[in-house]
Amino acid sequence: MALTSRFYNERYPEIEDVVMVNVLSIAEMGAYVHLLEYNNIEGMILLSELSRRRIRSINKLIRVGKTEPVVVIRVDKEKGYIDLSKRRVSPEDVEKCTERFAKAKAINSLLRHVADILGFEGNEKLEDLYQKTAWHFEKKYNNKTVAYDIFKQSVTDPTVFDECNLEPETKEVLLSNIKRKLVSPTVKIRADIECSCYGYEGIDAVKASLTKGLELSTEELPIRINLIAPPLYVMTTSTTKKTDGLKALEVAIEHIRAKTSEYDGEFKVIMAPKLVTAIDEADLARRLERAEAENAQVAGDDDEEDGADQEGMQFDPEKEFNHKGSGAGRANEEDEEEEED
């Protein structure tokens, strides 16, 4: 049986804490959920706390199996009742909760793996390891995520665990797994832009402009551009260095803007570069799926001849627009051949 433990020292969250939950079921009174950070204890999102607007369909607001942040509005520790609210969660709360949850989950996964290697039996021993390490630092610094930073610090300074009173074998296994599992996490950064040109160059101008941004793509900071629906595009990059990633997209955007202006095209930043949360990822995936379905429908309505004329002139939503493998060159070659004919 797999060992389990809550992520933090306190057994229950406090009122106004924002916590990550997974939806179990939906009933007349509201939605039953598991509090993922508190060893899956049960809570309820009351129907009146799902949305600020009039509820027409619960399933449009919350779905079974979905994971999302909610705020705690009542805790009865004696009876184990926890009431939660979705409508009171702000976008800032979502971002902070998502980041905290990711760090706490990484520590939980690490300590459970260490416990498995050491052959711990029973959740009590896992909690004891938590008490000596993660929860020790949580109480010392009054910060739920400080353990993540200290664990990472131990890669270069193992003495941070000297105050934890760990057995030599436990400390050795812990340090070994931290080095393998807590390397700098890769973060995804995203920006939304609109790029269009209604002049003579048309789609070629758009391709040339986007390619200008993609020329800044490197192995360390790969830049991708996905088509959502003309003229909307999503730019993304993945990196272990958040600041460098944000800067890379900002510079790429300016290159695209400058190139677009050369063609008297239109360019607009819809969303400046920002760190992508789990919710953003899910939203982007849905939009790409929808765009793919719409493109497939349009493609099905066109005859083969029309499709041949437009080869290389549209982006595949499932593939990044890459300057090394774009269809722009192929399209231009075909146009030249047609002119010769």
Curated annotation (Swiss-Prot):
GO MF terms held by the record: ribosome binding; RNA binding; translation initiation factor activity
Domain S1 motif intervals: 16-87
Gene Ontology BP annotations: translational initiation
The keyword Magnesium is annotated on this UniProt entry: no
CDD domains: S1_IF2_alpha
Acidic residues: compositionally biased ranges: 300-309
InterPro entries: NA-bd_OB-fold, S1_domain, S1_IF2_alpha, TIF2_asu_C, TIF2_asu_middle_sf, TIF_2_asu
PANTHER family according to UniProt: EUKARYOTIC TRANSLATION INITIATION FACTOR 2 SUBUNIT 1
GO cellular component: cytosol; eukaryotic 48S preinitiation complex; eukaryotic translation initiation factor 2 complex; eukaryotic translation initiation factor 2B complex
Subunit structure: Eukaryotic translation initiation factor 2 eIF2 is a heterotrimeric complex composed of an alpha, a beta and a gamma subunit.
SUPFAM superfamilies noted in UniProt: eIF-2-alpha, C-terminal domain, eIF2alpha middle domain-like, Nucleic acid-binding proteins
Annotated signal peptide: none
Residues passing through the membrane, by range: none
Name of this protein: Eukaryotic translation initiation factor 2 subunit 1
Post-translational modification: Phosphorylation of eIF-2-alpha impairs the recycling of eIF-2 between successive rounds of initiation and thus leads to inhibition of translation.
Record's keyword terms, sorted: Cytoplasm, Initiation factor, Phosphoprotein, Protein biosynthesis, RNA-binding
Region (Disordered): 293-341
Subcellular location(s) per record: Cytoplasm, Cytosol
UniProt record similarity statement: Belongs to the eIF-2-alpha family.
Modified residues (Phosphoserine): S51
Lineage top rank: taxon: Eukaryota
Keyword Repressor: no
UniProt xrefs under Pfam families: EIF_2_alpha, S1
UniProt function note: eIF-2 functions in the early steps of protein synthesis by forming a ternary complex with GTP and initiator tRNA. This pre-initiation complex mediates ribosomal recognition of a start codon during the scanning process of the leader region.
